Amino acid sequence: MIVRSFSDIENTDRHVKAASGTWESKRIVLAKEKVGFSLHETVLYAGTETSMWYANHIEAVLCTEGEAELTNDETGETHWITPGTMYLLDGHERHTMRPKTDFRCVCVFNPPVTGREDHDENGVYPLLTEEA
């Protein structure tokens, strides 16, 4: 059994701050735990815009605080995401988040991330392994 709190993660290598300056993420469960998924709490900052494309991962996101506009960049469809709303990127959709307020969410990734990932120039997380 693993028990881990946010205070255990803050200011460690599990507390990732994006090079873009638009978000930070506490990586709670990672690939090295070998449970088949990773679990993160992520905050996207108010007034920013983050374009993403999880070409190598499936992501489920549950908003716990704040508000943001989610745009499916492939269809142009937009959704207003508020606390209690979930979205699932089951088709590797390119998407953009525009938080109106600081937007806090819980994210699950499959395959699990290692904790070292950040979005590349295409908004993609590279597919890293624990051996990499």
Curated annotation (Swiss-Prot):
Pathway the protein acts in: Amine and polyamine biosynthesis; ectoine biosynthesis; L-ectoine from L-aspartate 4-semialdehyde: step 3/3
InterPro entries membership: Ectoine_synth (IPR010462), RmlC-like_jellyroll (IPR014710), RmlC_Cupin_sf (IPR011051)
Molecular functions (GO terms): ectoine synthase activity
Catalyzed reactions per annotation: (2S)-4-acetamido-2-aminobutanoate = L-ectoine + H2O
UniProt-listed GO biological process terms: ectoine biosynthetic process
A matching Pfam family: Ectoine_synth
Main EC class the enzyme belongs to: lyase
Enzyme Commission no: 4.2.1.108
UniProt KW keywords: Lyase
Family: Belongs to the ectoine synthase family.
Function, in words: Catalyzes the circularization of gamma-N-acetyl-alpha,gamma-diaminobutyric acid (ADABA) to ectoine (1,4,5,6-tetrahydro-2-methyl-4-pyrimidine carboxylic acid), which is an excellent osmoprotectant.
NCBIfam families, alphabetized: PRK13290.1 (NF009806)
Protein name in UniProt: L-ectoine synthase
Gene: ectC
